[in-house]
Each structure stands twice: as C-alpha cells, then as structure tokens.
Swiss-Prot record:
Polar residues bias spans: 42-61
Membrane topology: Single-pass membrane protein
Induction notes from the record: Part of the fla operon, which encodes the seven fla genes essential for crenarchaeal flagellum assembly and function. Expression is induced by tryptone starvation.
Regulation: The presence of the flagellar core components FlaH, FlaI and FlaJ seems to be crucial for the stability of FlaX.
Protein name: Archaeal flagellar motor scaffold protein FlaX
Residues on Cytoplasmic side: 31-250
GO-annotated cellular components: archaeal-type flagellum; plasma membrane
Organism listed in the record: Sulfolobus acidocaldarius (strain ATCC 33909 / DSM 639 / JCM 8929 / NBRC 15157 / NCIMB 11770)
Localization annotation: Archaeal flagellum; Cell membrane
Length: 250
C-alpha cells in the first residue's frame, strides 16, 4: 500500500513531469548543441584566415556573415531541440499517466481477487464445519453401511442389484415362523419357498444369531434404504405393517 500511496501523491507526479524534461534538455544541450557549435567554429576558422589573406580589405564583412550564419544555425538547432523536447515531454507524460492508471487498475483487481479468495475460503470452512453438513455426511455413511450389510446377506457384491422387497419378505417370514428353521425347511419342501428364498433366509438367520439382531430390525434397515433412494414401494410398506402388527389392509 506504500507504493500505491507514493504513486498517487502529487509530489511524485510533479517530480516526474518537471525533472525528466529538464534532464532531457541538459542531456541534449551538452551532447548535441555545444559540440555542434564548436565543430562549426573550428571548420570556419581556416576559411576566415584564407579570406583575410586574399582580401584584407573585406575582413570585417566576412566575419559578420560568419557570425550571422552561426547564430542562425544555433537558433534553428535550438528550435528543433525544443520542438523535439516538447513532443517527447508530451509522450512521456502520456505514457506515465497510462502506466499509472494501468498500475492502479491492476492493484484494484488484485485486491478484489484477494478479497474474493478470502471470502471463498471462509465460506468453504463454514460449510465444512456446518452441523447440518456433518449430519448429512453421517447419514450417508450410515446408509452406505446398511446397504453393504444387506448386500452381504443376499450374496451380492453390487448393492444396486439387491432386491429389497425380496429381502424384507424373507425377514417377515422369519418373524412369522419365530426363527424356527425346521418349519421354514418344511415350507421349502412343500414348495412354498423357493431355493433362492431359502438361501437368503438361512443367511439372514445366521447373521441374526451372530450379531444379536432381529429380522424385524433388518427389515427396518432395508426399508430405510428404500426410502433413502425413493423406492419405498406399496409392497414394502405392506410387509413393514405386518412386522409392526398392523396386519394387511386391502
């Protein structure tokens, strides 16, 4: 910010506008005008000596003509130099003004970018620490674990291929049969339970024995998964009502 204040100060602009033209004038004066004047005088000295030897009576007019020529040359050179200096000064001031405006705009854009970045980082930190986002993340992790559990029970490596209705139906059958494996085998032998259903039921029964969880709870987990994916069908609702003791309506 110190550089920006310096560039905006009137003293800095005055020094640039006055100091640079004066330095340029002195540079041109000592490097161009004075050496050129000395060369003209040196070249004219032998000519004056010759003319004095040939025409002694005309010495004074020759000197006057030479002085006039030298004065005209110097005046013309000064006019050219001053004209060039004015042109360069205008160009220099224009360039300084343009550069100053560009630098000012660049600094403003940089400040805006830094402010936007700071706000973005702050907003990102606020979102990541939001209790609402934490709850959503925990729910997603919980649903993911439930899907994994159900997938393992039905013997599928792809959770998307799990038939939740079929899984809940198997849990209902276990609850109705009070986890009696013999009764379930009799249903299988009579053809009321398919081999796929029997396979799933036996896996669920083994899982329940090892994890101390009920078939009703597993059915509720599967129903929650279906609800999370907006796939809670009327048939699933019917099976849940049976588990809750509400019977079957319609």
């Amino acid at each position: 910010m110190a550089i920006q204040d310096l560039l905006q100060s009137s003293l800095f602009i005055i020094l640039i506008g006055v100091g640079i033209p004066i330095a340029a004038f002195l540079e041109i004066l000592f490097r161009v005008i004075l050496p050129k004047t000395k060369r003209v005088q040196t070249q004219q000295s032998p000519q004056n000596i010759s003319q004095e030897q040939r025409f002694p009576t005309q010495q004074k007019p020759a000197n006057d003509e030479t002085s006039k020529y030298s004065s005209d040359s110097i005046e013309k050179a000064l006019k050219d130099v001053l004209g060039k200096m004015d042109k360069k000064e205008n160009e220099l001031l224009t360039n300084i003004t343009n550069s100053f405006n560009e630098m000012k705009k660049l600094i403003e854009n940089l400040n805006s970018a830094v402010e936007e970045l700071a706000l973005s980082v702050k907003a990102s930190e606020s979102d990541s620490s939001s209790p609402f986002n934490t709850i959503i993340q925990q729910e997603e992790e919980h649903v993911s674990r439930e899907i994994s559990t159900v997938s393992q029970l039905v013997g599928s490596n792809n959770p998307n291929n799990v038939n939740l209705t079929w899984f809940i139906k198997s849990c209902v059958l276990l609850e109705i049969m009070e986890y009696d494996e013999e009764k379930i085998k009799q249903l299988y032998e009579l053809g009321y339970v398919s081999s796929d259903d029997m396979f799933t039921i036996l896996r669920i029964l083994s899982f329940i024995k090892n994890r101390k969880i009920t078939a009703k709870e597993l059915a509720s987990i599967a129903a929650n998964i279906a609800e999370s994916y907006s796939s809670l069908t009327p048939e699933i609702k019917k099976y849940i009502m049976i588990l809750e003791g509400g019977g079957v309506n319609g």
